[in-house]
Amino acid sequence: VERTREPGESAFQRDQPFGRNQGNVSAERVVVSFKIELPKGLAPMSQLLLALSIVSFTDPPTAPAPRPVKQFRIVETRTGMELSLPRLADDLASRDIIYFGELHDNVAGHRVYADLAALLADRRPDLVISMEMFERDVQGVVTDYLRGRIDEATFLKYSRPWKNYARDYRPLIELARDRKLDVIAGNLPRPVAGKVASKEGSTSPFLPRKSTAPLDRYWDLFTESMKGHIGADEGMARMYRAQCAKDDAMAEGIADYLAVHPHRKPLVVHCTGDFHCDYGLGTAARLAQRVPLAQAAIISMVALPDISKADLTEDCKKAHYLLVVPTPPKPAKPPGKSG
């Protein structure tokens, strides 16, 4: 029996699909010989079948499939225990409100959240999804699409989705459409937020009925996060007023939904940037003021170059659970560009 393998290649590597050991190397021919003793008196055809069966048992064993690279970790911050996604869904199913705190540009994290939402819908058919990514004035458009009254093209035209909608948020909307779940368009419309920031008067019905901007820990974290983005203190204060108005709008939207469905007691998942819920601040704090008896859980997304070697001590202070995902690769520079 003659077989060809590359220099330094093991027998099982040789049998793998094309592409394992490519390169500019010369192949060596390896001759494997063996002798089979067959019982005498067998017919020629019987001898052939027996020989083939022996050869099949003398082939080299195949190597076990390589373990898949772990794409995310889920950590319960109270105990430090790592959880599987189904186990996390089991733990969360008894809550009233869950915050999916996200890094908006992390594709891996969005995929995990979409899978988790589906698992929660399996356990809680009364699931409701609230989203920062849609503004309050397009609630009717969102609901019309979920109920099949308009097609997707019309929905996309009038709902003003974020630019990464197709990749990152469409799975959630389609899950809601397939399972007949409600979606809350939670965010404050941008023009209204702009008027809040500039202290212009507004009678917009989409403003939260109550909104405050206290100079508390949330303000401290906000100013720290915005360093290098805004120069003047007054500019920082304007942005903070708009930030707080958005938090109050999203909290109010969820509280109002719960108020008009008092007998359902649904599980609400709120999808939002992690800053709106980390440390129980932002939207999380304002919803707790409006619905103080609700049992909430916060998940915060953490992106690291190597998720297997991470000191999460400080991150564990942010939330009840951490979703640890790889840092997205930096986009390649266009040819000929430098700096």
PLM feature segments, named:
Residues 123-128, 139-262:
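A substrate-binding/cap region within the structured catalytic cores of diverse enzymes
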Residues 249, 258, 262, 266, ...:
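C-terminal regions of proteins
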Residues 57-95:
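N- or domain-start disorder-to-order transition segments that initiate the globular core
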Residues 128-134, 298-301:
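Short internal beta-strands
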Residues 43-51:
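Sec-dependent signal peptide recognition
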Residues 80-81, 85-121:
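Zymogen propeptides
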Residues 106-112, 128, 136-141:
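Membrane-embedded segments
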